[in-house]
Amino acid sequence: MSPIVHAHADAVVVGGGVIGAAIAHQLALAGIGRIVLCDQGRVNAQGATSRSGGLLRLHHTARADTRLAARSLPVFEQWSDVIGGDCGYRRTGFVMLVGEEHAADLRFNAAAATEAAGYRRVEVIEPAELKELYPGLRTEGVALAAYEPEGGYADPMAASASLLTAAYRLGVSPSEGIRALKVLEHAGTVTGVLTSIGRIDAPLVVLAGGAWGSAPAEYLGIHIPVTARRIGLAQAELPGAGRRGAAASVPTCIDDTTGSYFRPDGLDRFYFGVPSKPDTELGRDVEPLTEAELESALNAIADRVPAAATAPLAGTRSGLDGYTPDKRPVVGAAGPDGLYLALGFSGGGFKLAPAVAELAAKEIVEGGAVPGKAVQELLEPYRPQRFLAGRPIRPEAPYDHM
């Protein structure tokens, strides 16, 4: 267990995944002062970041998400210059596949991505062209595909690790194995956080702890509807998966027709997602993926990637992530002055992390984490108050599986 370096700090960030790491880094860049980064386990090791597929895409069913993704993608592309280190960005191309019933929705969402993309190409292509681009795909049942040539994936663990390294170089202090129990306040202003080993006094507290991130705010009467779901990811051998033009070549892909997602992993392996399920017991180890779950997920993917039917498994991961009712994050000041939330990313936080951290840091530094101050327009749809007000984010052109 790491000792607390500062009993007094200028800011405490709770949560050592990619969101917490990115925000801590941005706060340090802004010269906020002494920053403590707390995590109940090991930073970058046990949370949703380490179980993320790392998909990088502009395509979403809500324009708010598209705009944040478009702001984040250049950071992944220029990671070594902007952050330092290597985030593992690979430009494989991203495709979104739909059946006939969602063809019009795909055109609508692709147009929104085009609007946000600037100079980047976002195309709607037919199954025949899709097959030419990625010979490893079976295109039966696909009516249209949205194709982003500059989409792809990155390595969430590598990205988070380099963010943490950059933050530490700027003076951020890690405190591992420290559970944040409750946010402390006096007269409407944050005074710190009570942890499992004592108190850290600070005028700013950022809760970015994924599935359990909102719990320390409950003591202040702040209820954020974030529920835990178990997420799963598996890796399998597929020679040529990441070799463009090879017989087994596949893109980074979300397939609405089968409810699956997958991507290459290097040249000769691929990752695929296993559907999430509710899991609210936050105090215990997460159950590993079962043989039945893996078989079901592989069978679905084999409808699109025939070679997956016989692909040997190379590894699996499972963990918890926090999901909101509208499957969009909660970002913004809440409750007493000095409390800021960045949680509930619902399986989609990695690709948004650079933009969220940049904009959140501006609201925290320039506005003191006070609601209504230094407002960043791109974050407005994600405010904690939207659920109480009955204004969840509603997809303009929804699919069955996004």
Model-derived regions: residue spans:
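Beta1/beta-strand and adjacent pyrophosphate-binding region of the FAD-binding site
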Residues: 5-19, 36
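Glycine-rich Rossmann-fold phosphate-binding loop(s) that bind the pyrophosphate
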Residues: 16-17, 40, 209
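Active-site substrate-recognition segment that forms the wall
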Residues: 25-29, 54-56, 85-93, 189, ...
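Glycine-rich FAD pyrophosphate-binding loop
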Residues: 28-49
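Dinucleotide-binding Rossmann-like beta1-alpha1 core, especially the glycine-rich loop
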Residues: 53-133, 259-261
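Short beta-strand to alpha-helix junction loop
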Residues: 63, 67-70, 96-105, 146-165, ...
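Helical element adjacent to the flavin cofactor pocket in flavoenzyme catalytic cores
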Residues: 147-203
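C-terminal catalytic lobe of FAD-dependent flavoproteins
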Residues: 302-402
